[in-house]
Amino acid sequence: MDGESSLERYLDQCDAEDVLASSAHMYTPMTPYDDLAIQPLPGTSYSSALEQSKELSTDFSSVDLSFLPDDLNQENEDQQEQQTSSQSLEQDSGICLDASNLSQPFTPSECRDASQDSTNLCPMPITPMTPMTPMTPVAESSGIVPQLQNIVSTVNLACKLDLKKIALHARNAEYNPKRFAAVIMRIREPRTTALIFSSGKMVCTGAKSEEQSRLAARKYARVVQKLGFPAKFLDFKIQNMVGSCDVRFPIRLEGLVLTHQQFSSYEPELFPGLIYRMVKPRIVLLIFVSGKVVLTGAKERSEIYEAFENIYPILKGFKKTT
């Protein structure tokens, strides 16, 4: 009996301890796992184990990578070479890329400022489609003034003309309708020639200046008036001016046509001169080996002078050295 009673008391005591333990777990507030203190087992040190794990995580020099395929090792080496080359290239060019700036989006104002800066730094010129005369820097003026040799002008007499009557009664006039359908009339001062058509149109050639051309045309109109025709003097206009000059040195035309083949043509078997068609001003030049130059196609005297000043430094570059 005493043994049974002592056994029962022992069991009751154990049950009471279990109830207290369970109630303590139920009513105690929960704490985060980080606040729980780690109770090391006797005979072990966690600090040394943590330090050893850190060393293992950071140091891979002793790890054997022989089991990896060669392709992966080659790719890693290529990536490292690209990174080092890009870094060295940035250092050489003075460009530094900031990852924080790249991650931030640009604002519209910044984009607009960047576009304006780029247009200011790198303007794109609009080149014309038509060929332009090559511009050669003129170091000094040529000192040569082309002389006008011929001026062609036209005028309208504004009346119908009887060419046979004009040829019979006017001096220094000839008319051959089988050869040319106009009266050819000449005067001595200024020394010019006129072509008079039955429609009343007249062409005056041979004058050496603009004033001489106008004066000669008026004299021809006066002759026609004296023959009984109601001639007027309308729409006088200079159609062509011809000038010439000498640069006083021989020119290598073969080299000139090769360099400026877009503007020039040279066929010595057909014509001994090089034909150079200038775009601005619109003048045609005949250039000869001797250095003589003929300029034609101008409407004004200034175009003759401008064309020669443009072509002179080019001719100087192809001067023959004997």
UniProtKB/Swiss-Prot annotation:
Q: Does the keyword Transport apply?
A: no
**InterPro entries reported in the protein's UniProt record:** TBP, TBP_CS, TBP_dom_sf, TBP_eukaryotic
Under the heading PROSITE patterns, the entry gives: TFIID
Query: Keyword annotations for this protein?
Result: Developmental protein, DNA-binding, Gastrulation, Nucleus, Transcription, Transcription regulation
State any GO CC term: nucleus
| Keyword Transcription regulation listed | yes
**Gene Ontology terms, MF aspect:** DNA binding; DNA-binding transcription factor activity; transcription cis-regulatory region binding
Its annotated compartments are: Nucleus
Where does the source fall among the domains of life?
Eukaryota
List the GO biological process terms.
Answer: DNA-templated transcription; DNA-templated transcription initiation; embryo development ending in birth or egg hatching; embryonic pattern specification; gastrulation; hemopoiesis; transcription by RNA polymerase II
HAMAP family reported in the protein's UniProt record = TATA_bind_prot_arch (MF_00408)
Query: Which family would the database say this protein is a member of?
Result: Belongs to the TBP family.
Give the function comment from the record.
TATA box-binding transcription factor. Members of the TBP family are differentially required to regulate transcription and development during early embryogenesis. Required for gastrulation. Regulates a large subset of genes that are ventrally expressed. Binds to a subset of promoters.
Q: What is this protein called?
A: TATA box-binding protein-like 2
Please name the source species.
Xenopus tropicalis (Western clawed frog)
Tell me the lineage of the source organism: Eukaryota, Metazoa, Chordata, Craniata, Vertebrata
